[in-house]
């Protein structure tokens, strides 16, 4: 087919896309989809030329999806039952508007389906894709349109969005979107920046098991229902700050390789960050958690900033490892605070923290400088079988307004013990081998870091009496 014939097809399809009839608009959209496929699969035409022509079509389809549709503003009214007490004329108008909204939703939903079919990835080996795990981008075959650019910014999706298992090789722009129904992006791969900032999700959001190979922008979003971002891999920087989570926020089992910005957010439902791994600096300051907050069994390879946050109910930060400085200064734990069995290799800053209920540091390892200056406790904190580094610059002078003291024995919290001289020497050597305390790629030190964690947890243990015996021996 000649270029002129394809140009004529493009012009005709655009005319159909502007029809007042929904079924004709759909025909125009499908004609454009077919034409884009023709450009990309024509082996007689230079590849770059076909790609440019296909990109023009994609841009047109995205512009249609983003174009305003007046009745979408009345989504809730038109999706409900016909109101009582309408006049016959009002009832006819309601039914007509409801039908028109449904027809346009079908057109736009079908366009998204056609796009999804062409950015959908499949395993390179021809097998079935694994579920409940992020895909390996090197072991998938991208879709025909995966290398093209998609800009849906500002779109109002008044119909379900399903981009499950998609490969966005040039990234995707979904900034400022509104999702009136469910949004599904599970097991997606983003080869360039993925932009979801300033979006509103009225329905459930599914973004789990996805891989972000460049930057990920999800800041200033409102998640109106449960949101699932479990098991994601962020290879670049990620911005999830200034979000409002109205439902449960599931962000467990994620891996963050770059700078992670999760500050200034409000969690009105449960917040779950269980088993997260942060390689770069993690900033989670100035957050408010209205329900349970789970951070246990996580690893921070660089500095962790969680200060000036409010935990209104139980906060579980147990079994967590901090390789860099950990900042909790100014936090308020209104519910129980579980920090037991955690390890701080760098400084642990709890200055000015208010612990208003039970506080558990049992079997914790605070091996850098521990700062509890100005902290306040409603109950005596538990440090049973904990371990401190007495050679560090520890500060234990609590606030004068604290209802309970921080009982000390031998200069450290009662129930805990100090590292022996031998343990301090071994710790220093192993920290150096693990690349701690300097700018480094923590991924290169996985084995020595894992070995050091095991040593600290299972060999640097025991009661104060046992430590004294070890020192004497």
Predicted regions and their residues:
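Transmembrane signal-anchor/signal-peptide helices with a preference for the extracytoplasmic
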Residues: 1-5
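N-terminal leader/targeting and pre-domain segments
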Residues: 8-15, 20-33, 38-473
